[in-house]
Amino acid sequence: MDMHMIVKVVAILAVLFLVYKLWESMNKPNASPLKIQNPYEKYMNSAEGGEYDAEDDDIYYPETDAEDDDIYTGETDDMYDGEDDDIYVQEGDDIEDAEDEPYDDSADMEQDVPKVQQPMMPLLTPSSQLLPKPSPEAADFAQFAPKNLQAQNFLTATQWIGVNTQGSSLKNANYDLRADPIIPKADVGPWMMSSVDPNIYQKPLFG
């Protein structure tokens, strides 16, 4: 018998042994199933039950913890659960209206408001110096502009330029009924050319 045959026989015996142990554990009458321990089992104990873990002292139970009730109602044995509210109520007062009372008087609060300090340096350019000073020449300006000259136009369109002449253009004709007179055609320059053409579409006043 060689070495390979011995190894195969030992492996078969080991497998048969494991199968037998598994079959034996499954056929036991009082065999308990495999149970995994719950890591939160110690925190599931209630203070009202029979079992209580002493390590869970930091768990807060509202029905058993009365250390944080700070409301005093005037009696020695009567305590009101108000969830850590530091409000002292006299006997016979309504607890709901206890927080609505003003803390300070409004007259005392006016004294606590800081006042705005006045600027130490005066203004370099006050508003009174920004306007021109009154002068007698400006006060007598009404003598040079009487009321009868308010609607008078002192500009004459035909005074400085000729009307109906060759060199006139009369672009700003204030007193003409027509737009402007006919621009005459005159070839000027070294090549006898001009860029200004006569207005041949100008209609006469009567015609």
Swiss-Prot record:
Residues 63-82 are annotated as: Disordered. Keywords: Capsid protein, Late protein, Virion. The keyword Ribosomal protein does not apply. Induction: Expressed in the late phase of the viral replicative cycle. Transmembrane segments: none annotated. GO terms for cellular component: viral capsid. The hydrophobic region might anchor the protein in the underlying inner membrane. This is Minor capsid protein P11. The gene is A352L.
